[in-house]
């Protein structure tokens, strides 16, 4: 009983400290503009990942397009999505520069990233599609637990409808299922976001099959993969989880270049 009370108190203190730091950073003067995030500045995110993360966070709150902020606020409400505010700036950068026509997400949850990519495709006039592979069940892993009172597939579709987006292509399967691997192999992908099971063995399998089915110059964004890097997350962010972080360390640098980091999301591009 005492241990449970102690954990509750510690958890609430962490949330309070995170909220205080978040407000402090939001109130800093904005000293950057959109040029900070142009393609020729992405190397800064590798060299100084913590500073770059703060720039993304501040830009989201002070200079970002309102409809993209509104999208994040919608998913941040009532537990509709995880992630961090700065990640919306990450996807905006990627879509602006790389303009993916075929996008695949492994691990959809309730559709925050999948719908954001669809929204950005519309804003940027990219004639593209979005595909999601997910069990759409409250299935967790060694580091994640999910609500059991949500129909995740139906909820994802409703969230797309809320933003008046085209219906996504949703595959109800674990990424290790044959139907999922068949879908991944069915074409070539411009961009893949791996955010499914965070256990190393599963994340590695996801990486390997996706890496084999990328277009030339294709992208893999690896979630929760910045432990053991120079990135030092603030109290309102995280560095990721051990499984994806170990996987990121093992990426073959003769096949992939790391081109961008925002927080615990790391972006790798297939060398042409």
Language-model segment annotations:
Residues 83-87:
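N-terminal pre-P-loop "Q-motif" helix
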């Amino acid at each position: 009983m005492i241990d449970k009370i102690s954990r509750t108190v510690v958890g609430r203190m962490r949330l309070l400290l995170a909220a205080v730091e978040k407000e402090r950073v939001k109130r800093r003067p904005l000293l950057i503009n959109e040029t900070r995030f142009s393609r020729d500045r992405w190397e800064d995110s590798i060299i100084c990942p913590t500073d770059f993360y703060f720039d993304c966070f501040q830009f989201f709150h002070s200079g970002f397009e309102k409809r993209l902020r509104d999208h994040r606020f919608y998913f941040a409400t009532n537990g509709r999505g995880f992630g961090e505010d700065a990640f919306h700036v990450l996807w905006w950068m990627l879509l602006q520069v790389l303009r993916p026509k075929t996008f695949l997400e492994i691990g959809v949850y309730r559709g925050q990233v999948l719908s954001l990519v669809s929204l950005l495709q519309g804003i940027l006039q990219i004639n593209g599609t979005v595909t999601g592979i997910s069990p759409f069940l409250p299935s967790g892993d060694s580091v994640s637990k999910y609500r059991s009172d949500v129909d995740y597939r139906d909820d994802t579709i409703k969230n797309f409808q809320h933003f008046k987006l085209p219906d996504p292509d949703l595959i109800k399967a674990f990424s290790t299922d044959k139907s999922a691997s068949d879908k991944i192999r069915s074409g070539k992908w411009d961009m893949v976001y791996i955010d499914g099971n965070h256990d190393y063995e599963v994340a590695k399998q996801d990486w390997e099959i996706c890496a084999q089915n990328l277009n030339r110059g294709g992208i893999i964004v690896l979630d929760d993969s910045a432990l053991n890097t120079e990135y030092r997350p603030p109290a309102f962010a995280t560095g990721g989880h051990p499984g994806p972080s170990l996987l990121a360390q093992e990426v073959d640098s003769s096949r992939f270049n790391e081109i961008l980091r925002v927080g615990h999301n790391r972006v790798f591009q297939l060398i042409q």
